[in-house]
Amino acid sequence: GIGQFSHAVRRRLNMLYLVENNGTYGLTKGQASATADPTSKNKKGLSTPFESIDLAAMAIELGAGFVARSFSGDKAQLVPLMKAAIRYRGFALIDVISPCVTFNNPPASTKSYDYVREHNAALDRVDFVAGRAQITADYEAGTTTNVTLHDGSVMALHKLAADYDP
């Protein structure tokens, strides 16, 4: 439940919390869940009177270090996200918009398959980037040092003098 979710995030448990978010409770034959959008309508044409709970925003607010949202119909985006989340050390959330074609698929539902497919817009190309060894630099105040990054590029770091006074 939502209480366990909150505590898992804030305790920074080392886990992937994968949500198949369809905005409905299938066992109750289409009752709106806490993640149902207020503008979304069920099979009977009724809207939920409540604001939806945005699990991704909640996870960020509670301090989760890895938060993503994807669509179950977009394998090219979802697979790299899952790989990255599994490798992440700490709490990772992926909120997967996953339409319930049985109880929450009318045209007015914002979680219907057609609606999500038509409004699915990737914000960026998603790919898995494997972890690398940490790069550190130890240098004196008032000096500059060049640091070579993993891709071979060089970054110049300058440390202000100890007596610097803006």
Predicted regions and their residues:
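Short acidic, glycine/serine/threonine-rich loops at helix termini
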Residues: 1-4, 27-32, 104-109
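Residues forming the flavin
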Residues: 15, 31, 47
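ATP/pyrophosphate-binding catalytic subdomain of soluble kinases
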Residues: 64-119
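Thiamine diphosphate
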Residues: 1-26, 77-80
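Conserved thiamine diphosphate
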Residues: 34-85
